[in-house]
Amino acid sequence: MGFFSAIKRLWKGDTAPEDVSKPVEAEGSAIVGTSSTGSPVGTGAAMPAAQDAPSPAAPHAIATPDDAVPDDAVPDDAVHGGEAPWKTELTLALRQAEPRLSVWLGHVLDGVDEAGPILWERLRFFFSSLEVPADEAETFVRDFGRWLEAMEYRYVADFRSELQYRLALALDLEDEEDERSRLMLKLTEGLARTREQIGRRIDGLLASHGRIDEGFWEELEEILIMADVGFEPTTQLIGRLRERARKAGTDDPARFRELLREELEVIFRAPRRIAAVNPPEVVLLIGVNGVGKTTTIAKLAYRAQLQGRKVLIAAGDTFRAAAIEQLEIWAKRVGAGFYAKTAGADPAAVAYEAMDKAVSEGYDLLLVDTAGRLHTKANLMEELHKIRKVLGRKHPGAPHRSILVIDATTGQNALSQTKLFNEACGVDEIVLTKLDGTAKGGIVVAVAMQFGIPITYVGLGEKMEDMRPFNGSDFAMALLGVEEKPAA
């Protein structure tokens, strides 16, 4: 969506306020300056008028932004051109607040308990005060309202996290401190069992050794292998840790956690492939059945749409009618376009015709699902080769990315799956699902070391917001239970 540019500059530190109690007046921002009109975005007939104290929504029906508002519900300030007290109070609160997404959202939602006219007007006023383009603001509010209605969410407590996630994506603020903190918390919770498997054993190792010696390395090898890091990656990792300890000139076990964290950060620093393409960007989703590929496609589509992209999903797994139906349901839920043929159709034909549709209808992103039948390895490889060939013929450079979806709970099987698909069609990125609650999180280290393929997203739950960009530093800290070293 690309709005809030002034606020993004403030958050990213391009402009620092001289006095922390008085935020900088960002260019073009009425919140950090002074509102000239005090009017919310959108005054068209289809938009509900602002309300100071509207009646709550009916228990069984959520008032959406599309619902009409009775004439007698329009407050005095809308009739006489004044500014309602809540607008003045909200503007002042936002100006004085710390420029963080969760803090600002807290002020916007202050006194709002459920979805309805009050929420829509406060969001519109918030956007208007930031001089957000009216059409973009209205699209955001409308789509969020429709999502609430579809999910049958009514109370703020049920959807606040989703609202913050949508704002973070729309603002490109996932690296903002609040969002990093939320992700770190999810990672820490999700890796609890893996951390217990590795962390507690490392604690015992450190407590039982006065210095880092051969016995120390032998015990560490056993710990890592038991944590699903695997024999070969463990051997490589210990070799690199030995060298790191030697360069640091230390044999003090107290330094070991920090050395391991630093090494893991290096391992996870594989550069992501960036392909400059003319739209649509074409992404091939691959992986065995049952790893969460369908929901991953839905979550990728959902993220892309919240970032302002038009998304088409193609059902390339034609060997299971249920797979086509399930993907269509998810496409409808997230509001993405959908293309499929009947069960048993040629997957390459589906990809080719979906490419036609994506080009002719102006889609920005095409996500192509594929089958994952490991018991027919030869046929699978041939099928993937054919899909890549027809996509490239139709749209030069396509597919621009091949994303492998792996289930973290499968442990060492993830390595054989990565090897198979990398040989079949090449893997550019990996999405690791079901990382929450597994004791086999060490497989992340194994995959990164053995193949050097960047892990771009991790699944930390069932909600749309629970698939987040992978950050190697955060993962290492959450895995080992160590804090980030403060900058010098």
UniProtKB/Swiss-Prot annotation:
Topology of the protein relative to the lipid bilayer: Peripheral membrane protein
Pfam families cross-referenced by the UniProt entry: SRP54, SRP54_N
SMART domains linked: AAA (SM00382), SRP54 (SM00962), SRP54_N (SM00963)
GO molecular function: ATP hydrolysis activity; GTP binding; GTPase activity; signal recognition particle binding
Keywords: Cell inner membrane, Cell membrane, Cytoplasm, GTP-binding, Hydrolase, Membrane, Nucleotide-binding, Receptor
Compartments, as annotated in UniProt: Cell inner membrane; Cytoplasm
Gene3D superfamilies in the record: P-loop containing nucleotide triphosphate hydrolases (3.40.50.300), Signal recognition particle SRP54, nucleotide-binding domain (1.20.120.140)
The UniProt record lists the keyword Nucleotide-binding: yes
Role of this protein: Involved in targeting and insertion of nascent membrane proteins into the cytoplasmic membrane. Acts as a receptor for the complex formed by the signal recognition particle (SRP) and the ribosome-nascent chain (RNC). Interaction with SRP-RNC leads to the transfer of the RNC complex to the Sec translocase for insertion into the membrane, the hydrolysis of GTP by both Ffh and FtsY, and the dissociation of the SRP-FtsY complex into the individual components.
Subunit-structure text: Part of the signal recognition particle protein translocation system, which is composed of SRP and FtsY. SRP is a ribonucleoprotein composed of Ffh and a 4.5S RNA molecule.
Name the record gives this protein: Signal recognition particle receptor FtsY
Organism of derivation: Nitratidesulfovibrio vulgaris (strain ATCC 29579 / DSM 644 / CCUG 34227 / NCIMB 8303 / VKM B-1760 / Hildenborough)
Organism ancestry: Bacteria, Pseudomonadati, Thermodesulfobacteriota, Desulfovibrionia, Desulfovibrionales
